[in-house]
Amino acid sequence: MRACLPTPPHARPVHGAFVQAATRGPPHSRRAPPIPPPYTSHRPPPGLSRPRLHPHRASSQIRSTPSASSSALPLSGHPAAMAATSDASPSPPKLHTRLRLWEFPDRYVFEPVDGLADLFLSVSRTNGSMSLVQELPPRGPSTNPKVRIVFGVIGVLRLAVGPYCLVITDRDCVGSYMGHAVFRVTGLKALPCHTASSAEQKKTENEFSELLDAAERSIGLYFSYETNLTLTLQRLYDLGDKFKALPLWRQAEPRFLWNGYLLEPLIENKLDQYLLPVIQGNFQNIHAEVRSEKVNITMIARRCTRRIGTRCWRRGADPEGYAANFVESEQIMQSKGFTASYVQVRGSMPFLWEQIVDLTYKPSFDVLRVEEAARVLERHFHDLQKKYGAVVAIDLVNSRGAEGRLYERYAKSIEPILSEDIRFIHFDFHKICGHIHFERLSQLYDQIEDYLKKHKYFLLNDEGKKIEGQTGTVRTNCIDCLDRTNVTQSMVGRKILESQLQRLGVFGADDTISNYPAFDADYKVLWANHGDAISTQYSGTPALKGDFVRYGKRTTQGILNDLCNALARYYLNNFADGTKQDAMDLIQGHYVSSVSRDIAVPGKPGALESFRVAFALVLGAAMFMMISLRQARNDLRHLVVALMWAGLCIGITLYVKKNGRRFCNRPRFFLSRN
């Protein structure tokens, strides 16, 4: 593991730049303080100095009230949340950063080796029960335990066969966030905490092994032992010191807490020092020098877990209004002692629709329960308003064809709620920009420029005082919310960053990022990597059109890469994503009541194996048909045989085409209307 260096002094934020947590319930209304007008000069305001960092450190361990589920986490500003911290110290308890795992025959024992505690965590290998013990069990020749180092406990996954304890076996430091080290999970291990004694239990355990393997391969997981990555700077700033004294898991935004369900057993046992909040998304830092001024940019992607899933098995929104592939992207800029951030979101079109794979390259779109579309969409936008303020929804799909039907449904459903605070803009990306003229996105910017200026961004001065806040966000979508969406979001982020740097005097009045080639190149790579990470988690491949984001233009290599990635997406969507979807749903607890022997066992060969058999039969029939045609030159009877083989080949092909969905890798815990 490479060393993680602290953020340099010039890049560290001011005290107070921290956020508010939110749950599914409505937050308490709060009147925003008056926002002073922007500075008219291109010089920063007087009184600039290096920001002062006040890292939070715990003097003693704090025990939290157990919670039965992640949805019960306290709401920021909620009386329960404030009362819970009335007697708390002004900083959260420290989390264990390094543990020695002892694997005894009857239990796992986690020994902290970071000097934070003398007690060990003991987890039963029979039933998963947890307790704190003062010493290791006695060791002998017959009980020689296996020992390894782990870097945290993700949580406990409860399956029908028994519980599994998920631990971090490897990590990689990827940078720092507000002066605190941030790590990416590079190794996960599921430790069985049950005994499969009967043949039936062993069979069930083997059937779950594929899902556990998929869970261990989860990508894009990030965490920090000292600060909560689930919260935006603006929300965190509004919390207050009492709320910040809560353990990190209680500060977390449940929508973005990837391991919220897994943490429940640890919460019930009040194991605060082991409760490590994890997000799925992306985290990056870049550092640049512009006109002798240091500029530091941080990009964070937070994937919502409410309707988490894969590209073709999670589309649209659920009846509660939670959209698929909903990702919050926060761009943070630090320069001259100032800290600024801008948040924008992406998410699938928020009504009920699906696109079930059926071996075709582009499966058909089906809008479900049309009569409920307006209600579901209203719920979604009402939730966005509570969390982000005003919303401008940018729809990038085609205006004609299959995508056009979705656009028409979206436009018709959102029309009743359009107002000054909810705007809708349709921008046919492919028609206007084509495959190479992405500079025409300036036409879209012209339509939202006034909105961006009106709703501003979050800005702190060098003393940690809030100069202004972001009062609205941009919600962008295409069909997948990946390729076209990332190109558009990078344009919005670029325009916001330029206005911030101009305001602080780092840029001149007419300066743009493209005027500084080194900075421009780094910034393009930042957004390209951001889009690739989100795309890989949802579709299994990097984003298409990534060469424009990365280099500012379309390239031959980029077009070839898009072709390869498109083919890879086809394979993964049809033959791999069903199992991946099951693993995601199990980790999030979405089907906790359904994980039983009845549905866990498909009892039939996998889709890929069935397709291979059909494909082999088609190839075999085609080969014998060719052989018979050659022999028909000498004996016409072979022509009849060739026609028989041709008929078999065509028959199998037509059967596979008609029943394509049966040959695809489908989730076992998901039943569509078909």
Label for each model-derived stretch:
Residues P9, P27, R31, P37-P38, ...:
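Enrichment for repetitive, rod-forming helical segments
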Residues G472-V492:
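A phosphate-binding catalytic loop at a beta-strand-loop-alpha-helix junction
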Residues M1-A81:
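Low-complexity proline/serine/threonine-rich segments in eukaryotic and viral proteins
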Residues L73-I467, I496-N674:
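Phosphoinositide system proteins, centered on phosphoinositide phosphatases
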Residues A3, P8, Y39-T40, C165, ...:
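Generic low-polarity alpha-helical segments
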Residues Q20, G47, Q61, N398, ...:
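Residue-level marker of positions within ordered structural domains that often coincide
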